[in-house]
From Swiss-Prot:
Record note on quaternary structure: Part of the 50S ribosomal subunit. Contacts protein L29, and trigger factor when it is bound to the ribosome.
The protein's name in its UniProt record: Large ribosomal subunit protein uL23
Keyword flag S-adenosyl-L-methionine: no
A Pfam short name: Ribosomal_L23
GO molecular function, one term: rRNA binding
Role noted for this protein: One of the early assembly proteins it binds 23S rRNA. One of the proteins that surrounds the polypeptide exit tunnel on the outside of the ribosome. Forms the main docking site for trigger factor binding to the ribosome.
Gene Ontology BP, a term: translation
Classification of source organism: Bacteria, Pseudomonadati, Myxococcota, Myxococcia, Myxococcales
PANTHER family from the UniProt entry: 60S RIBOSOMAL PROTEIN L23A
Family statement drawn from the similarity comment of this UniProt entry: Belongs to the universal ribosomal protein uL23 family.
The UniProt record lists the keyword Protein transport: no
Source species: Anaeromyxobacter sp. (strain K)
Keyword line: Ribonucleoprotein, Ribosomal protein, RNA-binding, rRNA-binding
One Gene Ontology cellular component: ribosome
InterPro entries per record: Nucleotide-bd_a/b_plait_sf (IPR012677), Ribosomal_uL23-like (IPR013025), Ribosomal_uL23/eL15/eS24_sf (IPR012678), Ribosomal_uL23_CS (IPR001014)
Length: 97
């Protein structure tokens, strides 16, 4: 699927697990478009944040079942990507500056 660069990365994931991965292994977590490939994620992160990406690992997270009263629905499945950066590169968005 042909996606624009700004459509590939949806938002950063700021969780405790993602913070541990960032501090220990220079891995940054993002929610990405469900149809995006690892190559598209790599190109998008490099272009948007001006960094050098070494590795991309992706996983599809299952949507949770949700209830509102008697009605039962389901949130959609979504994809997350852990991106490993070159030594010395950082993304200011995650650093809180």
């Amino acid at each position: 699927m042909n996606l624009a660069v700004q459509d590939v990365v949806k938002r950063p994931l700021i969780t405790e697990k993602a913070e541990r991965a960032r501090e220990a292994n220079r891995q940054y977590a993002f929610e990405v478009h469900r149809d995006a490939t690892k190559i598209q994620v790599k190109q998008a992160v490099e272009k948007l944040f001006n960094v050098h990406v070494l590795d991309v690992r992706t996983a599809i997270a299952r949507g949770k079942n949700k209830r509102v009263g008697r009605n039962v629905g389901r949130r959609p499945n979504w994809k997350k990507a852990y991106v490993t950066l070159k030594e010395g590169d950082t993304i200011a968005l995650f650093e809180g500056t």
